[in-house]
A protein has these predicted regions:
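Short glycine/serine/threonine-rich phosphate/pyrophosphate-binding segments
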Residues: 109-116, 137-138, 254-255
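Solvent-exposed alpha-helices and their adjacent loops that cap or buttress functional pockets
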Residues: 10, 34-35, 94-97, 120-122, ...
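A glycine/threonine-rich phosphate-anchoring loop and its flanking beta-alpha core
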Residues: 19, 116-209
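C-terminal charged capping/lid subdomain of soluble metabolic enzymes
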Residues: 2-7, 186-189, 287-362
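Active-site segments that bind and position negatively charged phosphate/pyrophosphate groups
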Residues: 202, 206-315
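ATP/NTP phosphate-donor binding region
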Residues: 1-101
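Alpha-helix C-terminal capping segments
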Residues: 113-124, 259-260, 280
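Residue-level signal for inorganic ion chemistry
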Residues: 21, 42, 80, 131, ...
Length: 362
């Protein structure tokens, strides 16, 4: 087995390792140790299971009591009560119990859904993350946020439930569609924008190599982003403070996702447009020079990501943002930049927010 690079999310007795490397699904003693003697439910989607489902089953079956593969339809629409219920039905049919293990094999949708299935099954069982998309590898697989969507808002139903292990096999990215790759780059850009301008500048330099799936560039970005995410989660697991900074671009972005209908805009695409809007708000609040907004917009554009939002009535955006998870008594709270590499949270005057939205519609 190739030696993975190991990062640790330091949460005391609930700490866990993140493995990053190539070929980690071919041979993996740590992953097998987690599954040893247990009933394992490998939850994946209709795109990923045909490619990697049998591989993960073959890796775990020799040590597990049983391996059950559960497949949900690909796409954001699967983050719903019906799919969660179907997963629990299949687990109960297979007689999984409180000692069983769930493995989330796929992108961010599968990770969120399978993680919530683990958090809610028999009051909580162990799970491991095997992210196969760039977005999941650099962001959503780390930190323990799990959940499903509601018609009124994204990720409105869920729980914090930390994985026991994250296995990020960079080899899985070679099968990732170019649109999904670009969506993952939105989260890479976000990490640099909120926490490390030098990293953001390196991402800009590496962008052609990242879009070409060049292994060294991808590994560099994944490790750097995971270090930022792991440090933030260790400092603020439950999002009482600094972890909210990871939602830069998400207040505007979630409004785009909900308004368009889940899955019409990929999460990373919506966050990309949302970051431009949040950065413009930062400029108008006097927190960041306009030149840095232009720099961020150029980097986002270079990743083949949108920088403008759908041309809906501004009132529609405000209605969706009022039930954002960061909202305080229905008043939106925004993550803004005190210059590239430095994030903060703030409220903003509604008239100013309206102007920002209106100026960034297609």
């Amino acid at each position: 087995m190739p030696s993975p690079q190991i990062l640790t999310v330091d949460l005391g007795e609930r700490s866990y390792d993140i493995q990053v490397g190539h070929g980690l699904l071919d041979e993996n003693p740590a992953f097998q140790a987690l599954a040893r003697g247990r009933s394992v439910a490998v939850i994946s989607d209709s795109n990923v299971d045909p490619i990697y489902g049998a591989k993960v089953e073959a890796l775990l079956a020799p040590v597990a009591h049983q391996v059950v593969r559960i497949v949900v339809p690909a796409g954001e629409a699967s983050k719903c009560w019906q799919q969660l219920d179907a997963i629990h039905d299949r687990m109960l049919e297979a007689r999984l119990d409180r000692k069983s293990l769930i493995v989330a094999l796929g992108g961010g949708v599968v990770g969120d859904l399978a993680g919530f299935a683990a958090a809610s099954f028999q009051r909580g069982i162990d799970f491991g993350q095997v992210p196969t998309s760039l977005l999941a590898q650099v962001d959503s697989s780390v930190g323990g946020k799990t959940g499903i969507n509601h018609a009124r808002g994204k990720n409105m139903v869920g729980a914090f439930h930390q994985p026991r292990l994250v296995v990020a096999d960079t080899g899985t990215l070679k099968t990732l569609p170019s649109r999904e790759l670009a969506a993952g780059l939105a989260e890479v850009i976000k990490h640099g924008a909120i926490a490390d301008r030098t990293y953001l500048e390196q991402v800009a330099v590496d962008m052609p190599a990242l879009l070409a799936c060049q292994p060294e560039a991808l590994a560099r970005a994944i490790l750097a982003s995971m270090r930022i995410k792991a440090a933030v989660v260790a400092a603020d697991e439950r999002e009482a403070g600094v972890r909210a900074h990871l939602n830069f671009g998400h207040t505007f972005g979630h409004a785009i996702e909900v308004g368009a209908g889940y899955g019409k805009w990929l999460h990373g695409e919506a966050v990309a447009a949302g970051m431009v809007m949040a950065a413009d708000l930062s400029v108008r609040l006097g927190r960041m020079p306009a030149e840095q907004l232009d720099e961020l917009r150029r980097i986002i554009t270079s990743a083949n990501l949108p920088t403008r939002a759908p041309a809906w009535p501004v009132d529609d955006y405000l209605r969706h943002m009022a039930i954002d998870k960061k909202a305080d008594h229905g008043i939106p709270v925004f993550v803004v930049l005190n210059g590239l590499g430095h994030a903060a949270t703030t409220r903003a005057d509604e008239a100013l927010v309206r102007a920002v939205i209106a100026d960034h519609l297609r």
